[in-house]
A protein has these predicted regions:
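Membrane-embedded beta-barrel scaffold of Gram-negative outer-membrane proteins
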Residues: 71-85, 194, 202, 236-293
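Flexible loop and strand-edge segments within Gram-negative outer membrane beta-barrel domains
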Residues: 3-5, 13-72, 78-103
Length: 294
């Protein structure tokens, strides 16, 4: 394995209450596994080799009001990946491949600080975001191509009431995924209680989802075992959902110059409509497996 990385991050103070931040990075990485490492991968008995070229960058504008009640930002970022790969065994000349992935996102977020909202001070946060990912994975020797384009539009809203002893957070997120025919709502809630400065008790609930996708890195791993595989999505495939509940108690105590911290934490997560793969069937020399909800 060897690699090199170069990049920069900088900002420009546009006014007393605003700034513009920009960054860029470039990375090259080579990895090789298997045997006969001093020979080309197709001359080895088993080989995994990847060579990445990654370019990415972002731009962000932040504004803060003079009275510190309003803050606003707008951002955009993008990353392009080009990867040449070999996953195969038995001196297989067909196991070379190439993967390209272009991902970009843009969005905005607004925060308003209430001196008092109903019963205590709070911060209201609202935002929107759009994310697009276009991936193409080719293994020409096996006539296998995966072309996947994903668009996700999101909006979120939350309000957090807080003082020295209590904190209440209620919020939710709406997501529209182009591979799912309905809007997904993901709520979240958090309760914090500090009976003293050294004791922090917290109870949280959150939910999320995992969208269907045809591409899976495990496809390349199967090639090493001699199997050429593709994944199809079942027609009635739904998103995978998660519901999580967590609780924690965080206690601090100081003994002279020393401070100890005691933390107890527990969580419970429930998954529904979990993704699974069929054993599949061979079509034209390619193992085709179907992703479905278990």
């Amino acid at each position: 394995i060897h690699g090199q990385t170069i990049g920069f991050r900088s900002f420009l103070k546009t006014t007393t209450y605003s700034k513009l931040t920009f960054e860029y990075h470039h990375m090259e990485e080579f990895r090789r596994g298997g045997d006969l490492l001093n020979r080309p991968p197709h001359e080895a008995n088993v080989a995994e080799q990847t060579e990445h070229s990654i370019n990415g960058g972002g731009l962000k504008y932040d504004y803060f009001s003079p009275n510190e009640k309003h803050s606003f930002n707008v951002f955009a970022s993008a990353q392009h990946i080009n990867r040449d790969s070999y996953y195969g065994g038995g001196q297989d000349l067909n196991a070379y491949g190439n993967t390209t992935d272009l991902n970009w996102m843009a969005g905005s977020q607004y925060v308003y600080s209430f001196g008092k909202c109903i019963f205590m001070p709070s911060d209201l946060t609202a935002g929107i975001e759009f994310n697009q990912d276009k991936l193409e994975d080719n293994m020409w020797g096996y006539h296998r191509t995966v072309d996947q384009k994903v668009n996700i539009g999101s909006a979120f809203l939350q309000n957090e009431w807080k003082n020295d002893h209590w904190g209440f957070l209620l919020g939710g997120r709406l997501d529209k995924h182009n591979l799912i025919d309905h809007i997904i709502f993901s709520p979240r809630a958090n309760l914090r209680f500090n009976p003293t400065q050294n004791i922090n008790l917290r109870l949280s609930y959150s939910s999320g989802f995992r969208a269907p996708q045809a591409f899976d890195e495990d496809l390349h791993v199967e090639n090493v075992g001699g199997n050429v595989a593709m994944v199809e999505l079942a027609k009635d495939l739904k998103e995978e959902r998660s519901q999580s509940l967590s609780a924690s108690a965080d206690i601090y105590h100081r003994f002279g110059a020393f401070q100890i911290n005691f933390l107890v934490e527990g969580f419970y997560t429930k998954l529904s409509d979990v993704f699974a793969l069929t054993d599949g069937e061979v079509k034209d020399g390619i193992l085709t497996r179907t992703r479905y909800n278990a």
